[in-house]
Amino acid sequence: MAKEDVIEVEGKVIEPLPNAMFRVELANGHRVLAHVSGKIRMNFIRILPGDRVTVELSPYDLNRGRIVYRYK
């Protein structure tokens, strides 16, 4: 999938799930299932409930996403 096709939105981590998955509530109120991107995983960045994150959504499946950035 090309980088131009993704939708980037901000959200807040609601709960951690097994296998590095997280339930994220987006700014518009929707809740999505998101996994951690490879760069965040490689740099050992911890994501905890309550963290503000940027999530990339595919236009084909708006219920799943990838966490690409955690705000400080």
Swiss-Prot record:
Q: Note the PROSITE patterns from the entry.
A: S1_IF1_TYPE
GO terms under cellular component? cytosol
Which GO MF term does the entry hold, naming one?
Answer: translation initiation factor activity
Keyword ATP-binding in the entry? The reply is: no
| Domain of life assignment | Bacteria
Q: Matching SMART domains, A to Z? A: S1 (SM00316)
Q: Where in the cell is it found?
A: Cytoplasm
Q: Where is the S1-like domain?
A: 1-72
Supply the InterPro entries for this chain.
NA-bd_OB-fold, RNA-binding_domain_S1_IF1, S1_domain, TIF_IF1
Swiss-Prot/TrEMBL keywords: Cytoplasm, Initiation factor, Protein biosynthesis, RNA-binding, rRNA-binding
User: What is this protein's function per UniProt?
Assistant: One of the essential components for the initiation of protein synthesis. Stabilizes the binding of IF-2 and IF-3 on the 30S subunit to which N-formylmethionyl-tRNA(fMet) subsequently binds. Helps modulate mRNA selection, yielding the 30S pre-initiation complex (PIC). Upon addition of the 50S ribosomal subunit IF-1, IF-2 and IF-3 are released leaving the mature 70S translation initiation complex.
Report the family membership: Belongs to the IF-1 family.
What interactions and quaternary structure are annotated? Component of the 30S ribosomal translation pre-initiation complex which assembles on the 30S ribosome in the order IF-2 and IF-3, IF-1 and N-formylmethionyl-tRNA(fMet); mRNA recruitment can occur at any time during PIC assembly.
Q: Which NCBIfam families match?
A: infA
Identification of the protein by name: Translation initiation factor IF-1
Q: Which organism is it from?
A: Moorella thermoacetica (strain ATCC 39073 / JCM 9320)
